[in-house]
A protein has these predicted regions:
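Conserved ABC ATPase "signature" C-loop
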Residues: 218-219
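The feature captures the beta-strand-to-loop junction immediately N-terminal to the Walker
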Residues: 39-41
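Conserved ABC ATPase "signature" region
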Residues: 117-135
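Helix-to-loop junction immediately C-terminal to a conserved catalytic motif
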Residues: 54
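ABC ATPase NBD Q-loop/coupling interface
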Residues: 63-80
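Conserved ABC ATPase signature
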Residues: 139-143, 147
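Catalytic Walker B motif of ABC-type/P-loop ATPase nucleotide-binding domains
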Residues: 164-167
């Protein structure tokens, strides 16, 4: 369980202790196996929250816990947290550390001190999950940005985390590659019980998640299912967000008399499953 209890966080710059809080008295919990999308405009606090959950940052006040372990701890507890919580950043170059694909994926398991046979097993498994077998010996510098992001995710998955944090990992890659990556991690959540926390500003990416958290000015503004969140289009627009295009289309058709359609449509498949017929 990831738990955030009354957490406030401020970035101190140049020694100033009175910086405006990036997060203010945030409370939430994420149980094992849950898929959660966190959305919000730039500066809403969503990436700060991710870094707190991964113990990269420590709260200014309040408490963040991973399976009961405090993220402001040190030593063995902190080491355990960083094994259990994997994070993938927006720019893969920020976390790729080796010169070849296979060496980068091996980096995490090797630092866990695992036997060689288990390291090899994890490498092969992670490469298969992300379709990277053909690129094993390729130099990182020769990869596209999308391929680099696949390697970054594979490296995190090779650590076999319980919680996978995706901090806007699709911003720099194509829609096709983004869809494949999200399908892979969503499938892993279903098959292995990994919690996936996906931070994004692309509304169409969150429709398949069980839960959506909306951040605004360091606060949790909404926390509900995608259907319930996107039913509140006016409130989202008031904080600089919007609903997916397919949701807009479904609502427009519903308003024009296509009564078989649900009021909130989340996918093209839903449109296909509800043939339009007007009153």
């Amino acid at each position: 369980m990831l738990e955030v209890n009354n957490v406030t966080f401020s970035y101190s710059t140049h020694g100033e202790q009175d910086a405006p809080p990036a997060l203010h008295e945030v409370n939430l919990s994420i149980p094992p196996g849950e898929t959660v999308a966190i959305i919000g405009h730039n500066g809403s606090g969503k990436s700060t929250l991710a870094k707190l959950l991964a113990a990269i940052l420590k709260p200014t006040s309040g408490l963040v816990q991973v399976d009961g372990l405090r993220t402001d701890a040190s030593g063995e507890d902190l080491w355990t947290i960083r094994q259990r919580v994997g994070i993938v950043f927006q720019n893969p170059d920020d976390q790729l550390v080796a010169s070849t694909v296979i060496d980068d994926i091996a980096f995490g398991p090797e630092n866990l001190g695992l036997p060689r046979f288990e390291i090899e097993e994890r490498i092969q498994e992670a490469m298969a999950l992300l379709d990277l077998e053909a690129y094993a010996e390729m130099a990182i510098k020769d990869l596209s940005i999308g391929q680099k992001q696949q390697v970054a995710i594979a490296g995190v998955l090779a650590m076999r985390p319980r919680y996978l944090l995706l901090d806007e990992p699709t911003t720099m890659i194509s829609n096709h590659t983004a869809r494949r990556l999200l399908d892979t991690v969503y499938r892993l959540s279903q098959e292995r019980g990994i919690s996936v926390i996906h931070i994004t500003h692309f509304m169409h990416e969150v429709t398949g998640f069980k839960r959506v958290i909306v951040m605004h000015e360091g606060h949790v503004l909404m926390d509900d299912t995608p259907t319930s969140i996107f039913a509140r289009a006016g409130e989202l627009q008031a904080v600089g967000l919007d609903v997916p295009m397919v949701t807009k289309l479904g609502r427009r058709l519903h308003q024009q008399g296509w009564s078989r359609l649900p009021e909130v449509i989340l996918s093209i498949d839903q449109l296909k499953a509800n043939p339009c017929s007007s009153n």
